[in-house]
């Protein structure tokens, strides 16, 4: 059986908002598996967490750049926020975004692309040597449409086109480009705030949907619901889940009456003058999924003093 540490209990508690003793029991019941412990708590009705939250700890900048029917979003990491506020680093991020807009989202292609007398990889190496801190082009994504607009939004912008979060949204339409651009930016802001996981229910990972179905069913069985009612209750629960995680199903943040994103887009077709289709979206939050190495400050001081 796995040893349950205080750090594990703390992580589960921060992820789920559940009390310490319940978190400890959940970890004990699931042999220390955090994801399984979250499901165990949900089945007991103690947690609404859908999955383990990524521990965001990396520094750097998200860059986003669009040009009519195409757009890119990139993440460049640094070791400290101090460097992220450095003008040379900011210029590096903007340059990489410009290159990505030309060559696409493949990291090897971006790194090999020529810039001046060097390449992107060479420019990153030069910046590392000059600034004295490690930097990495972590990821990139691109969207394009044959006609329409790719719009972007940067949240907590440090400079124009770069900040702590970036979103691009692709709209396919033969309508007015200026109206599409306004709608696209509003949708990008919605994506930043609502963090949808998929465009619609059919775009969700079937394994994720099945996991939700099983968690809900087990929860209602433990509540003593009749088996012949559970399937219907679960289906209704999935509809609610879709409204939480699917972009087209979500309540549009720019509408106080609670219309869905799909309804808002449909209504916008009047201004645009043509049908509109959301082809895709990408949302990058700085450092998501990266865990920063933690240290015990007291232990470091003791070690430096020769204590044990």
From Swiss-Prot:
InterPro entries: EF-Ts_dimer_sf, Transl_elong_EFTs/EF1B, Transl_elong_EFTs/EF1B_dimer, Transl_elong_Ts_CS, UBA-like_sf. GO terms for molecular function: translation elongation factor activity. Keywords: Cytoplasm, Elongation factor, Protein biosynthesis. Pfam families: EF_TS (PF00889). Gene3D superfamilies: 1.10.286.20, DNA helicase RuvA subunit, C-terminal domain (1.10.8.10), Elongation factor Ts, dimerisation domain (3.30.479.20). It is found in: Cytoplasm. Residues 80-83 are annotated as: Involved in Mg(2+) ion dislocation from EF-Tu. One of its GO terms (cellular component) is cytoplasm. Its main location: cytoplasm. Associates with the EF-Tu.GDP complex and induces the exchange of GDP to GTP. It remains bound to the aminoacyl-tRNA.EF-Tu.GTP complex up to the GTP hydrolysis stage on the ribosome. Belongs to the EF-Ts family. HAMAP family: EF_Ts. This is Elongation factor Ts. It comes from Rhodopseudomonas palustris (strain TIE-1).
